[in-house]
A protein has these predicted regions:
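Conserved beta-strand signature within the Rossmann-like core of class I S-adenosyl-L-methionine
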Residues: 283-291
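Conserved SAM-binding loop of SAM-dependent methyltransferases across substrates and taxa
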Residues: 173-189
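Class I SAM-dependent methyltransferase Rossmann-like catalytic core
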Residues: 120-156
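A short SAM/SAH-binding and catalytic strip from SAM-dependent methyltransferases
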Residues: 247-267
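S-adenosyl-L-methionine
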Residues: 206-243
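C-terminal lobe and adjacent flexible extensions of AdoMet/dcAdoMet transferase-like proteins
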Residues: 349-459
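N-terminal auxiliary segments of SAM/dcSAM-dependent transferases
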Residues: 4-17, 23-120
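Class I S-adenosyl-L-methionine
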Residues: 298-302, 306, 313-377
Length: 459
């Protein structure tokens, strides 16, 4: 056997590093090309709705609401989000040299969270540079997403009272807790006990400082209120014992990381995690789960939704029905073609400094994407055949797609399954819209989309 040359260990390391760098460059190139092509494609395929005359309609819109309505955001929450970088700087200051390097650190961490996630250390946020990059960029964007979702959830989504218990699993820098405080002012007056669980004690400690600073700026309306919730930090991962039973359990951007170390089938992972969640839950517990808008996460959300329904809970949002998920992302982890549930909203109202930081890091965002579910105790609608019903609720899931004949469509979710909503007359429709229709023709007579097989509803 040939003896290893003394320098081989160094050249191999250098080669591995070079391969990683080349992989990263290629990823950047392909991603930038994708978004450039998409933007150019959208520009080319603008539909001239003035040319659409006398197109027969399948349905008439009775009502419309959007699950990311910017106008539902509290004014003080918007001010905090706009100045979030200043809040972080007061708690975890960076010098000019570190600030100059921040965009590069953000981009490097972005790779660890995406194309390099398989080799990422699970305790990545214990590193100083990575924690700073995460809080100053990813936490900021997550707050933008989560506050928009929380502010638009139904008014009865958080039936919490004084001394109610909240358990936030995978807390990181307490992003969910901070977002909930900002987006739901009625909860600021409550004496809540919030257990925050994460494997990184230092990350939670920084997050608690951020939360307390935010609570001092976005104050409770009741002058006699405590002014903040009681935070109890628990070091550990899901399954770690907590003696109190929860009235609300939240998890954001946590379950997708399980795929890094759990190679069971998604169904088995969901079975395991639903048991873990219910081990913490009281009888009246509600659940909120949010994950990144990517196929594997969308598939997992759909599996958890199925299990919540089996447990007798109702889905308060985002689904317009309690039936089987028609966009369940089956085989998503293997690149399957099935549609998967994720929503997006425009970043035009995002904090200006955050948008600028995104540009500096080479990660421009025109859309914020999220997959989520809110499940709570309540009566489930009877599972009867509603296919000929005069009214139909649909949730617009996709961004606009361009169909043959210069038409514009949106893949959407309904109690009858996936449908393709065809926008014939230039109505303002976007992902996250929940539309109530009156059907003008029998559902069974609708034309089918050739690509997906979904019934087309022209409005």
């Amino acid at each position: 056997m040939e003896k290893e040359k003394f320098y081989s260990r160094f050249t191999e390391k250098k080669s591995a590093k070079a391969d990683a760098q080349n992989k990263r460059k290629e990823f950047n190139k392909q991603r930038d090309k994708y978004f450039d092509d998409k933007r150019r494609g959208l520009d080319k395929k603008e539909v001239n709705f003035s040319d659409k005359k006398n197109i027969p309609l399948d349905a008439k819109i009775l009502s419309s609401a959007n699950m990311f309505n910017y106008d539902k955001m509290p004014a003080d929450a918007l001010k905090v989000l706009e100045s979030f970088d200043s809040i972080v700087q007061s708690i975890r200051p960076m010098n000019s040299r570190q600030m100059q390097k921040l965009p590069k650190d953000i981009r490097a961490l972005s790779h660890q969270l995406t194309d390099e996630r398989e080799t990422r250390n699970v305790s990545y946020m214990n590193a100083t540079e990575q924690l700073s990059a995460y809080i100053r960029y990813f936490t900021w964007w997550n707050l933008v997403r989560l506050t928009r979702v929380f502010a638009n959830l139904p008014s009865d989504s958080f039936n919490l009272k004084d001394d109610s218990v909240v358990i936030d699993i995978g807390s990181g820098p307490l992003t969910v807790v901070t977002a909930l405080w900002l987006a739901r002012p009625e909860l600021r007056n409550k004496k809540l006990i919030v257990y925050c669980m994460d494997i990184s004690q230092s990350t939670m400690a920084v997050g608690e400082e951020i939360y307390m600073s935010v609570a001092a700026k976005a104050v409770a309306s009741d002058a006699n209120a405590e002014g903040f919730w009681k935070i109890i930090r628990v070091k550990g991962e899901i399954g770690t014992e907590i003696k109190r039973r929860a009235n609300l359990i939240t998890c954001a951007n946590m379950f997708n990381e399980l795929y890094q170390k759990d190679h069971d089938a998604p169904e088995k992972i969901a079975d395991k995690q639903i048991r873990n969640l219910f081990n913490y839950a009281s009888e009246d517990c509600s659940f909120f789960i949010a994950e990144p808008g990517m196929p594997v996460a969308g598939r997992f959300i759909s599996l958890m939704r199925e299990r919540f329904l089996q447990k007798g809970l109702k889905v308060a949002s985002p689904c317009p029905h309690q039936k089987d998920c028609p966009m369940n992302g089956l085989h998503a982890r293997y690149g399957g073609s099935e549609k998967w549930c994720n929503f997006s909203f425009s970043t035009e109202n995002a904090p200006s400094k955050l948008l600028k930081l995104s540009e500096s890091a080479g990660l421009p965002k025109e859309r914020a994407v999220i997959s989520f579910i809110m499940a709570q105790p309540g009566k489930i609608a009877d599972k009867k055949n509603l296919r000929e019903k005069d009214s139909l609720s649909v949730a617009i899931v996709s961004d606009p797609i361009y169909l043959a004949g210069h038409r514009q469509g949106f893949y959407s979710c309904s109690e009858n399954g996936m449908v393709l909503v065809v926008n014939a007359y230039g109505k303002k429709i976007k992902s996250g819209d929940v539309l109530e229709f009156t059907m003008l023709r029998p559902y069974s007579s609708l034309q089918k989309d050739k690509k997906s097989g979904a019934p087309e509803i022209t409005i």
